[in-house]
């Protein structure tokens, strides 16, 4: 039997306040929103990051938190229903509302967040890409913490393997598997640092849509790479030629990112 690392079983409940359990899973998402909100406020407060480009004020960032959070929840759930398990939810339509049972799609959440951004931009009379660039710059914070939460739960584990760091996950049978949640956390964490470096050090926020495009390309490539190690959803399996739904949904994301980067560089950076 190959050497495996013992899975560090962690109580999913951090603490209980009376009858209310506080779960690591929920805490990770809340922390992602709060830290992302704080970093977004930092971005818009620094005029030098934006040059002469129109940027939202701090009040807009507070609204942006609400709009994107709702968009991620609604879009993530609907994306999972449509892309990953439509047959089940057609037979059990009321289960669509049972969010506590799990089942969220990043790509659906991304679409939902995009809709939220567009609605807020229209309401406040701001350029959509100004808000989109902010969301893209902070999104990897939540993605990193979310993948750590997937590992703690545990869920979304990897494929069977004999690598020295393989783990046997509770509920995933007796085979050692890739800790693919940690791979995704690392990739999305690295993406965060890349975006921070590009946005803050190289002035990417001065080019409308550049940060959004870089995020789309970076996340799409990281997701496709990590899908080679992640166990596909059991109700879908492999679609064709070893491809998974996560891979296919990431391809248009990369294409959109490339288009945005090209758009950003066809326009002059806005000087201070």
Curated annotation (Swiss-Prot):
Pathway: Protein modification; lipoprotein biosynthesis (diacylglyceryl transfer). InterPro entries: Lgt (IPR001640). It is an enzyme of class 2 (transferase). Pfam families: LGT. It is a multi-pass membrane protein. Belongs to the Lgt family. The gene is lgt. Catalyzes the transfer of the diacylglyceryl group from phosphatidylglycerol to the sulfhydryl group of the N-terminal cysteine of a prolipoprotein, the first step in the formation of mature lipoproteins. It comes from Methylocella silvestris (strain DSM 15510 / CIP 108128 / LMG 27833 / NCIMB 13906 / BL2). The chain crosses the membrane at residues 24-44, 64-84, 99-119, 125-145, 185-205, 209-229, 245-265. It comes from the Bacteria. GO terms for cellular component: plasma membrane. Its EC number is 2.5.1.145. A 1,2-diacyl-sn-glycero-3-phospho-(1'-sn-glycerol) binds at residue 147. Keywords: Cell inner membrane, Cell membrane, Membrane, Transferase, Transmembrane, Transmembrane helix. This is Phosphatidylglycerol--prolipoprotein diacylglyceryl transferase. PANTHER family: PHOSPHATIDYLGLYCEROL--PROLIPOPROTEIN DIACYLGLYCERYL TRANSFERASE, PROLIPOPROTEIN DIACYLGLYCERYL TRANSFERASE. GO terms for molecular function: phosphatidylglycerol-prolipoprotein diacylglyceryl transferase activity. One of its GO terms (biological process) is lipoprotein biosynthetic process. It is found in: Cell inner membrane.
């Amino acid at each position: 039997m190959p050497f495996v690392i013992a899975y560090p079983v962690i109580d999913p409940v951090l603490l209980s306040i009376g009858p209310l359990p506080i779960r690591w899973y929920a805490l990770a998402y809340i922390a992602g929103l709060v830290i992302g909100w704080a970093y977004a406020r930092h971005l818009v407060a620094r005029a030098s990051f934006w040059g002469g480009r129109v940027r939202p004020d701090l009040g807009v960032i507070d609204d942006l938190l609400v709009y994107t959070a709702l968009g991620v929840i609604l879009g993530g759930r609907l994306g999972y229903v449509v892309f990953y398990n439509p047959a089940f939810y057609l037979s059990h339509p009321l289960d669509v509302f049972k969010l506590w049972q799990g089942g969220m799609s990043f790509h659906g959440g991304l679409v939902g967040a995009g809709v939220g951004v567009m609605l807020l931009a229209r309401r406040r009379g701001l350029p959509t890409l100004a808000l989109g660039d902010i969301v893209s710059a902070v999104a990897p914070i939540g993605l990193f913490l979310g993948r750590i939460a997937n590992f703690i739960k545990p869920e979304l584990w990897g494929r069977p393997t004999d690598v020295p760091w393989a783990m046997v996950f509770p509920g995933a049978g007796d085979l050692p598997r890739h800790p693919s949640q940690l791979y995704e956390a690392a990739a999305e964490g690295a993406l965060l640092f890349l975006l921070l470096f590009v946005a803050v050090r190289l002035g990417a926020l001065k080019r409308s849509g550049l940060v959004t495009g870089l995020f789309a390309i970076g996340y799409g490539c990281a997701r496709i790479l990590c899908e080679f190690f992640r166990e596909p959803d059991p109700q879908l399996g492999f679609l064709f030629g070893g491809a998974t739904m996560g891979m296919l949904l990431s391809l248009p994301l990369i294409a959109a990112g490339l288009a945005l980067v090209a758009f950003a560089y066809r326009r002059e950076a806005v000087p201070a």
